Amino acid sequence: FLELAPSPAPRQAIEEVVQPTSEDFSALVLKIQANMDPNHHDRIVFMRICSGKFEKGMSVLHRQSNKTIRLSQPQQFLATERTIVEDAYPGDIIGVFDAGTMGVGDTLCAQKHKVTFGDFPVFPPEFFARVSPKDTMKRKQFQKGMTQLAQEGAVQIFEQPGALDSFVVGAVGMLQFEVLEYRLKNEYGVDLLNHTLPYSVARWIDGDV
């Protein structure tokens, strides 16, 4: 299979075109998944190695926060099985634990050679709803769950000034609201109130006042 698969391609960064043959490490965050282990409520960041060699326990620069992060316990997944990764190369996708620092589209790179990959495209939502917890005593779990699921890209959150117990959320399809409701109930123990809103677009308006 590896002999038939295409080689890793160069990737355009803001500063330059990153070649997979470069010795300087760089990686792009492709996906975030919370609660892959329901017993530990972990948060796994999946990243694609774009250049250089990944080694277990290495420290890299997170470009968006400009902080140094140590990538410990890197893993690869096959169904429910997890395998610790000692090293990885361009084209490989690995998962690492994250406490909430990284987001989809973020860049990790070597300190000595800084690059920044462009943002991921975000599809504009076409359906909107106001969601809130049925039990107001579970506001903390509700806010945590909404934040983590929005970071995954399950829905987009549009915050309302002063609203702590509800969020306006947007989705590309109605199925996303069902997924949101199911995951909040099963992963965070929060039953959801979902009120559909009569909107179809959300846009930033530029202009002079």
Identify what each model region corresponds to.
Residues 1-209:
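Structural and coupling elements of P-loop NTPases
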